[in-house]
């Protein structure tokens, strides 16, 4: 049977876990096999900028960081389960990718 690989990514951990739990509940209700959510390494994007706009004065820096959290879910591509997954309300800050694999 075909599998669906669902990749979730977000800067907000709570909304990411919420979507992953909804997918998990759908899998339990429909009785399909599921593995995950597997936490993937968090990508940390760091940007360091000078506080002073003109370059004069003491060298003080602002440090900014953006963390991108990811989860991976493999689920059997059952038609009923996939229809319910497609109808999940996904918050704006969560990116979702669904890929069918054999």
Curated annotation (Swiss-Prot):
Gene3D superfamilies linked: Ribosomal protein S10 domain
One Pfam family matching this protein: Ribosomal_S10
GO cellular component: small ribosomal subunit
Record's keyword terms, sorted: Ribonucleoprotein, Ribosomal protein
Top-level taxon of origin: Archaea
Recorded GO MF terms: structural constituent of ribosome; tRNA binding
InterPro entries per record: Ribosomal_uS10, Ribosomal_uS10_CS, Ribosomal_uS10_dom, Ribosomal_uS10_dom_sf, Ribosomal_uS10_euk/arc
GO biological process: translation
Quaternary context: Part of the 30S ribosomal subunit.
NCBIfam families reported in the protein's UniProt record: uS10_euk_arch
HAMAP family: Ribosomal_uS10 (MF_00508)
Entry similarity comment: Belongs to the universal ribosomal protein uS10 family.
UniProt function note: Involved in the binding of tRNA to the ribosomes.
Name of the molecule in the record: Small ribosomal subunit protein uS10
Encoding gene, per UniProt annotation: rps10
């Amino acid at each position: 049977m075909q599998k669906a690989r669902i990749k979730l990514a977000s800067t907000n951990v709570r909304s990411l876990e919420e979507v992953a739990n909804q997918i998990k509940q759908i899998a339990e209700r429909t009785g399909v096999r599921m593995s995950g959510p597997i936490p993937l390494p968090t990508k940390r994007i760091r940007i360091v900028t000078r506080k002073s706009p003109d370059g004069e004065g003491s060298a003080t820096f602002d440090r900014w960081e953006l963390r991108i959290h990811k989860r991976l879910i493999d689920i059997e591509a059952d038609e009923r389960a996939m229809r319910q997954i497609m109808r999940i309300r996904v918050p704006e800050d969560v990116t979702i990718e669904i890929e069918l694999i054999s």
